[in-house]
A protein has these predicted regions:
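Loop/turn positions that initiate beta-strands
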Residues: 1-6
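Short, charged beta-turn/beta-strand-edge "cap" motif at the junction between a beta-strand
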Residues: 9-14, 47
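Conserved catalytic-core segment of NTP-binding enzymes
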Residues: 17-18, 24, 33-73, 157-173, ...
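Charge-biased, low-complexity intrinsically disordered regions
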Residues: 26-30, 74, 79, 112-116, ...
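Solvent-exposed alpha-helices and their adjacent loops that cap or buttress functional pockets
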Residues: 35, 78-84, 95, 109-112, ...
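Walker A (P-loop) phosphate-binding motif
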Residues: 72-125, 236
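Short glycine/serine/threonine-rich phosphate/pyrophosphate-binding segments
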Residues: 99-105, 127-131, 187-192, 216-218
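N-terminal phosphate/diphosphate-binding loop that engages ATP/GTP or pyrophosphate donors
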Residues: 108-151, 223-226, 239-249
Length: 279
């Protein structure tokens, strides 16, 4: 038979990698591992850049006392509450636009200031690697949508909204000084990113848009009336790109791997996040 593995059935709609859905699985039970973290479904479209996905075959559900076990069985019912800590929101124009890199840099800078930092990934397909990497740079806690019972946020908006409410409640219980929140993919994709951004809008003190190129910055800005504090990612890789972002949108772009730009970000964080917390 081969190895037996446990995962979660779900959907993925990655613009640069894989599209798949467990609902498309045929009677033969053949499907794929849509992520390395155990999101299972039948791949229906895949980038030619990728190696072949791991093929798997459905053998049955995990059960306990003759009842199907689901991720939501392990989500504790909690009284709803909203965090009162400032939120740094990191959004992107697509996947692989530098969001996690930017989040890690921000987390490290805030941790160096002695702040209690919670890092969270609000949307995407289950892959714990991204958010877990924030622990390595000083986050006190990390949480994502999996902790709210979702293997992927490609789901009905009502279901996602309930999961997001639980996630924010969990974060509030940790009493952070500051929250670094990454919205995976982009707000225009079917991961409920727009829902997440709307829900957090009253809490956001600083926003970073990670973009694949300067024109993508303009597209997201126009589509969502989103004016970030700074732009990062490939759209800030060169001085030509930085100048074009400024010309198109009026927003400052920073190559966060550059020492001078990183220092500019640190001063921005000190002014908008650290100083108000110390008063």
């Amino acid at each position: 038979i081969g190895d037996l593995v446990i995962g979660a059935l779900g959907k993925r709609a990655a613009t640069l990698e894989v599209v798949g859905d467990w609902n498309h699985t045929g009677v033969n039970g053949e499907m794929h591992a849509l992520t390395g973290a155990g999101l299972f479904g039948l791949a229906t479209s895949m980038s030619t850049w990728l190696l072949p996905l791991t093929p798997i075959r459905y053998r049955g559900h995990v059960t306990r006392a003759d009842q199907k076990v689901t991720m939501r069985d392990f989500v504790e019912t909690l009284p709803s509450t909203t965090p009162d800590a400032p939120v740094i929101l990191v959004v992107g124009t697509s996947m692989s636009a530098g969001k996690t890199t930017a989040a890690r840099i921000v987390v490290r800078m805030l941790a160096e200031r002695g702040l209690r930092v919670v890092a969270t990934k609000l949307t995407g397909a289950a892959r714990y690697r991204d958010i877990l990497s924030c622990l390595d740079v000083g986050a006190d806690y990390v949480l994502d949508f999996v902790d709210a019972g979702l293997p992927s946020t490609v789901c009905p908006a009502t279901r996602y909204a309930a999961a997001l409410d639980h996630l924010l409640t969990r974060i509030a219980m940790l009493k952070p000084d500051v929250i670094v929140a990454e919205a995976g993919a982009s707000p225009m994709e079917p991961y409920n990113g727009a829902t997440a951004c709307d829900r957090l809008k009253p809490l956001v003190t600083l926003s970073i848009l990670c973009a694949s190129d300067p024109y993508a910055v303009l597209g997201v800005q126009n589509a969502f009336q989103l004016r970030p504090d700074i732009v990062a990612g490939p759209a800030a890789n060169t001085t030509a790109a930085v100048e074009l972002v400024k010309k198109l949108t009026g927003v400052r772009a920073l190559n966060l791997r550059d020492a001078g730009a990183a220092e500019e970000l640190r001063m921005l964080l000190d002014r908008k996040i650290v100083a108000p917390l110390q008063t």
